[in-house]
Structure formats: structure tokens, C-alpha cells
């Protein structure tokens, strides 16, 4: 039995749906019936043949601007990757994963110039990424995981500034007046800047000192959190609470707090950011800002494919509200 017979439609309709032909009006119910039939029969369109006909590769490049060590220790990114892959699979696209050295971001431009992908989903944009801006000027379809200020490149993100402000306000409401911060990444990354700005905003509204000595840089890994926390513990006066802008970085920071003989939260309250699956199993369970990693990956992948297919999107970008998840590390 072929897909057309199982779905009770013509072979032309099957071809339109599985090849994502633009400009064809097909109901959502019919589209779902065809995709379900194709899945049941383990049918996959011939990508090489589609490329010859359309000039497209039916592949999107998922670019991760982090080192392999950072990617392998990150509990957040796998959920993003899974979301992108699910969105792509539902539309008959493939995903090409491309880790990029943070100091050589231009390397991913070859994915486009060598005709490997039809568009790029980029996680962790940097303010000084010239290759990204060059591709944007060339009208290459791009979707960012995280906002890039002063550009019109579409993105999916949680309001990181508001989330950081929410996290620090929680600590202020618990009576803390000396609050440190460890960033998720170096401060040339926009995500780190946004979370730092939220930290500062909360302190200023509460008329508390915004001391730069209380901010230490993390770099996506537990090891960076451990070193940053050791440095923060040397600051006078020592903070009684810390906002750590990444749950993964918080793993190392919590270890440093315990090695210093301090108790959480009595001596040092801790709030993280991301709400990775392991956060509720930390010792103690981690108060954190929730990021729907899978949902952001899926939404970004789905929107990118619609852009590739030539759909005019007024809602290409997606900015979600932040949500505080309260656990024992801060109360």
C-alpha cells in the first residue's frame, strides 16, 4: 500500500505535502492524514531528487556557538536540538548540527556558500558576529535562539532581562541586600548581557548597590561556575545570595559554596536560570527561572522553515514571559 491509498488522497496531493510545495491550499486535516500515513509506512521523500527539482537541500543548519566541551556538559541544549529536529522532521527537512568555535564564528557561513543548508538556526548569537550580519544582508534565512539588539533578525527567546530581574527580586524579597551574580557566558554574548541587565535593574529599583565586583563570569560549564564562585567568596563584604544565570554553571558554584563550609540557603541563597531537568534533583533543589527549551527549539525550527518556504511572517519572532520556579536553594 502506498501513502496516497492509505491517506485516501491523490498522489499529487501527497507530493505537494511531502515536498512542501508553496502556494498550494491543503487543509490541516488532509496534511496530517498524509504525514501520518507516510510515518506509518516509513516513507521518506528522496532528498537528492527534491534538491534537483527545487534547488533546495531541505536541510537547516543548527549552529551552536560553543566549544565541544561546553556542548557536551550542557543539559539545556539537547532539549533545544530535539525541538528543532522534531519541527524539521514534521516538514520533511533534515538538520545539520554544526558546533562552532566561539572564536571562529565565521566558519558556519560555509554551510550556506557550499549549498549544504537552506537556512540557519543559530544558538548563542554574539554582538560582534560579522559573519552573521553578512549572511543577513544577503537575505539568507536565519532564526536566532536569543535576541540580537539593533537588528531585525527573527528570534525565539524567553525575556531574559525580565527573568533575571524576577530571580533577583525573589532574593530581595527574602531579605538579601548583598547579592552576587555569576553570568552564564562571557559578556560579549547577548544572553549574558541581558541577564546582567536584569540583575542590575532589580538592584537599582530596590536602591541596593550594583557593585561590579559582585559580578563574575561563567562560561557555560560547571568548572567555570566553581572558579567564579570561589572568586566571589573572596569579595568583601561577602554576598549572602547569588544569582547564577545558568543551571549548569550553578552545579560548580554550589560545590564551591559547600567546599567553603557554607550552607545553602542559610549562609548563601542560590537562584539559577534555565530550569534544566536536573535542577529539581540538586542538593538542595534549585530555585530557577524556567526556559521551555524544547518548545523554543521547535518554534524556532518551524518558523525558520516557513521563512525558507517563502511565507511572509508577521510573527516570525517569539518572546515568552519568564517564570520563577521556587525550590529549597533560596527559601
Per-range role (PLM):
Residues 1-58, 331:
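N-terminal helix-turn-helix DNA-binding module of bacterial transcription factors
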Residues 6, 40, 86-90, 137-144, ...:
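Bacterial carbohydrate/catabolite-sensing allosteric modules
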Residues 20-21, 67-71, 185-189:
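Short histidine/acidic/glycine/proline-rich micro-motifs that form metal-
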Residues 55-169, 232-234, 238, 248, ...:
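Alpha-helical recognition/docking segments in bacterial nutrient-uptake
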Amino acid at each position: 500500500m502506498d501513502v496516497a491509498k492509505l491517506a485516501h488522497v491523490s498522489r499529487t496531493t501527497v507530493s505537494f505535502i511531502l515536498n512542501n510545495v508553496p502556494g498550494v491550499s491543503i487543509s490541516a486535516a488532509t496534511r496530517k492524514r498524509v504525514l501520518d500515513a507516510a510515518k506509518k509506512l516509513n516513507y521518506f521523500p528522496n532528498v537528492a531528487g527534491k534538491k534537483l527539482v527545487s534547488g533546495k537541500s531541505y536541510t537547516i543548519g543548527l549552529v551552536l556557538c560553543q566549544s565541544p566541551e561546553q556542548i557536551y556538559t550542557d543539559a539545556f541544549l539537547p532539549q533545544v536540538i530535539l525541538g528543532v529536529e522534531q519541527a524539521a522532521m514534521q516538514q520533511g527537512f533534515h538538520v545539520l548540527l554544526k558546533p562552532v568555535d566561539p572564536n571562529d564564528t565565521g566558519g558556519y557561513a560555509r554551510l550556506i556558500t557550499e549549498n549544504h543548508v537552506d537556512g540557519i538556526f543559530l544558538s548563542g548569537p554574539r554582538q560582534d558576529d560579522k559573519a552573521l550580519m553578512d549572511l543577513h544582508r544577503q537575505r539568507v534565512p536565519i532564526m536566532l535562539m536569543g535576541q540580537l539588539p539593533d537588528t531585525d533578525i527573527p528570534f525565539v527567546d524567553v525575556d531574559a532581562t525580565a527573568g533575571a530581574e524576577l530571580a533577583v527580586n525573589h532574593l530581595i524579597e527574602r531579605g538579601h541586600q548583598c547579592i552576587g551574580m555569576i553570568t552564564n557566558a562571557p559578556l560579549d554574548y547577548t544572553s549574558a548581557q541581558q541577564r546582567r541587565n536584569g540583575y542590575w535593574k532589580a538592584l537599582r529599583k530596590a536602591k541596593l548597590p550594583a557593585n561590579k565586583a559582585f559580578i563574575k563570569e561563567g562560561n557555560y560549564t560547571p568548572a567555570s561556575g566553581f572558579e567564579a564562585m570561589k572568586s566571589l567568596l573572596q569579595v568583601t563584604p561577602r554576598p549572602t545570595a547569588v544569582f547564577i544565570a545558568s543551571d549548569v554553571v550553578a552545579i560548580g558554584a554550589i560545590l564551591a559554596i559547600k567546599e567553603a563550609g557554607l550552607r545553602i540557603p542559610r549562609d548563601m541563597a542560590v537562584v539559577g536560570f534555565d530550569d534544566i531537568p536536573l535542577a529539581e534533583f540538586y542538593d538542595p533543589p534549585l530555585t530557577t527561572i524556567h526556559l521551555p527549551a524544547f518548545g523554543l527549539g521547535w518554534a524556532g525550527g518551524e518558523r525558520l522553515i516557513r521563512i525558507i518556504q517563502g511565507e511572509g511572517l508577521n510573527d516570525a519572532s517569539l518572546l515568552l514571559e519568564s517564570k520563577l520556579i521556587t525550590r529549597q536553594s533560596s527559601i
